[in-house]
Amino acid sequence: MIWKLSERKDWNSLEQQFGWVRDMNQVPQHTVHHAEGSVAVHTRMVFEALLRQPAYLMLPEQEREILWAAALLHDVEKRSTSVDEGNGQVTSKNHAKRGETTVRTLLYRDIPAPFNIREHIASLVRHHGLPIWLMEREDPLKRACEASLRLDTSLLKQLTVADICGRISTDKEVLLEATEFFEMFCREQQCWGKAREFANGTARFHYFHTPRSYIDYVPHDDFKCGVTLLVGLPGM
C-alpha cells in the first residue's frame, strides 16, 4: 500500500485540509533571495519545478510521494522563525531544524506514516539546504556521509533543485551549480543514493565521534575479555 500525505494535491484543497498550509500565506520572505513573495507562493512554485524534473517523474510512486511531502513541508517552520530585519531582509534561522521536529510530530499524530517514511521526510526537510552549502562548511565529507545514513542523497538533490528553481532570485545559476558539485562529491565518496558503508558498526561509531578521523579506519576490536566462572554445588 502506498502511503500518501494527501490524495488531493491541488493548492486549494491543501489549504482547506491543513492549517499549516494556510499559515504559509502570511509568512514573508527576503525580497532579494525570494522575490516571488510569501512562503505559500514559493512552495507552489517548488511543486511546479518538481513536476518538471524528469528524474522525479521516473521515481517509484512511493518515492514520489515522499519527495512531494518533503517539498510541501520544507519551509513549514518559516512561520515560527522568520524575523523582519528591515529593508526587505527577512531571516529564518533554524527553520529547517525546527521543521524536522514539526514534520516528525505531524506524521506521527495527525497523518500517521510508517516509521521509515516519516523519518525520511523529516530528514529531507532538515537537510534541504545541504547541497547548496555543503562544500563551504567544515568537514563536508562527514556531513554528507551522516546525511546519507538518514536519507537518499539523490532525492535530496531533487528537492534542493526544486527549491532553487521555485523562487525568483539572481543567484539561481550559482546555487544550481552547487547542487551539481554535491552530486559529484557524493558519488566520489560512495554515498550517492545510498548509505555510506563502513566495515562494521565500531568503525562507523569511531568515524562520527572522533574529530579529524579517517573514514575507512577500522579500530582494533578490543572488546573481548576472558571470564573465569566458578561453580560450586550445594553441600560440597
Language model feature labels by segment:
Residues R187-M236:
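Glycine-rich phosphate-binding loop of ATP-dependent small-molecule kinases
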Residues L51-L175:
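Divalent metal-dependent catalytic cores for phosphoryl transfer on phosphate-bearing substrates
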